[in-house]
């Protein structure tokens, strides 16, 4: 019997039976969201280099950034300044219009008959198997974004509960990079589901993009939490660290938001190799070595996720050498400010007239929250704009309606 000893816990754990299934999702599109697709491409390379078979990894990514007209490195993606191309060799299963909340949930649940587009691959897991999901995109209070839709906390939780009921896994780890990502699990994720979730931020704060002030003429190359957990794995190796140790390391490094964990915290005592790696004998050298030295040479410059497009445009305008280019950038910046003003005025009016005593609180009625989110998304306003430009008013509207 092979055993693993946690460096911070004296308990012994058997190597799990079954297979590891990995699902990697970049929920955004557009040039300014470069970092999400670079994050997922890096995660794919990390899993492959840690021995996870290609057939056990499913990738969902719009795939419009690597060959975007503004990309000076056509056909390549970078997750750190002057790093290696993480796009080469990437296998994408669902791209373009097939990157949807419905497909994501059907892929997770193994519902091959319900997926649309893509190659139709789903997680074909069994009761003894492990599942690792990494999601990166924008988020809001009780929701995460996809290119043309949103996924609510109720829909995600319903799928997870169903997977547990149908014995689709033995252990499940979920890493989520998004603003307010903690709201997808806080007071919702039952520890009896044997799911351990780690989020880039708590329920009420922004996550952060990083490597934003790079000299490669690119938007932010990665997200702070995402870059930190992947570099932590590369720095320490999958067989030398537990999920709990990685959580502590990443929490300390991600100093601009509060990295949180939820669910079955006992799973955190298990080695990251059970969820971020495969066959130890098939492991090859890490993609990025000498991480500590690299950080000294390339310190991270991080920006709030919602302000990345605005701040990048301002940077381009400040360095523009052509008057016409500068004027065009100035007009784009003005449009962003005007969009924000309109949306802020709308939500301020709603709060003032309907919810004068709104208070922030955890989501208690998932169905009510789900109904409010979908009503706004289909009738009132594009929630992807709300996610990017304004979130606190939406938070208050949801929480107040739910708890009134």
Each predicted region: which residue ranges?
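Cysteine endopeptidase catalytic domains of the caspase/legumain-like
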Residues: 1-404
């Amino acid at each position: 019997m092979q055993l693993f000893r946690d460096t911070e816990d004296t308990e012994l754990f058997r190597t799990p039976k079954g297979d590891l299934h990995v699902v990697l999702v970049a929920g955004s599109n557009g040039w300014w969201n470069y970092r999400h697709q670079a994050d997922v491409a890096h995660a794919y390379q990390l899993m492959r280099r840690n021995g996870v078979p290609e057939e056990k990894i499913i990738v969902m990514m719009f795939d419009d950034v690597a060959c975007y007209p503004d990309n000076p490195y056509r056909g390549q993606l970078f997750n750190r300044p002057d790093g290696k191309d993480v796009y080469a060799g990437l296998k994408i299963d669902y791209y373009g219009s097939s990157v949807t909340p419905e497909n994501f949930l059907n892929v997770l649940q193994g519902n091959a008959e319900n997926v649309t587009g893509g190659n139709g691959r789903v997680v074909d897991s069994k009761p003894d198997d492990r599942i690792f999901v990494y999601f990166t995109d924008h988020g809001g209070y009780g929701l995460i974004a996809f290119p043309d839709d949103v996924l609510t906390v109720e829909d995600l939780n319903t799928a997870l509960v169903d997977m547990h009921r149908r014995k689709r896994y033995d252990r499940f780890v979920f890493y989520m990079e998004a603003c307010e990502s903690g709201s997808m699990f806080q007071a919702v994720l039952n520890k009896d589901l044997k799911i351990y979730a780690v989020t880039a931020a708590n329920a009420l704060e922004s996550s952060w993009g990083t490597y934003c002030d790079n000299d490669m003429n690119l938007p932010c190359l990665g997200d702070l939490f995402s870059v930190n957990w992947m570099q932590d794995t590369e720095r320490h190796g999958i067989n030398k660290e537990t999920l709990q140790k990685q959580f502590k390391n990443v929490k300390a490094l991600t100093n601009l938001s509060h990295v949180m964990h939820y669910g079955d915290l006992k799973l955190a005592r298990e080695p990251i190799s059970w969820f971020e790696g495969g066959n130890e004998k098939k492991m090859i050298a890490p993609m990025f070595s000498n991480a500590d030295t690299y950080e000294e040479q390339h310190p991270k410059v991080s920006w709030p996720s919602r302000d990345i497009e605005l701040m990048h445009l301002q940077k381009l305008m400040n360095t523009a050498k052509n008057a016409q280019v500068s004027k065009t950038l100035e007009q784009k910046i003005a449009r962003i400010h005007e969009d924000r003003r309109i949306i802020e005025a709308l939500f301020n009016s709603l709060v003032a007239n309907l919810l004068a005593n709104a208070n922030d609180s955890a989501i208690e009625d998932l169905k009510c929250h789900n109904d409010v989110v979908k009503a706004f998304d289909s009738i009132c306003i594009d929630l992807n704009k709300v996610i990017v430009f304004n979130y606190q008013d939406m938070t208050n509207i949801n929480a107040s309606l739910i708890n009134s």
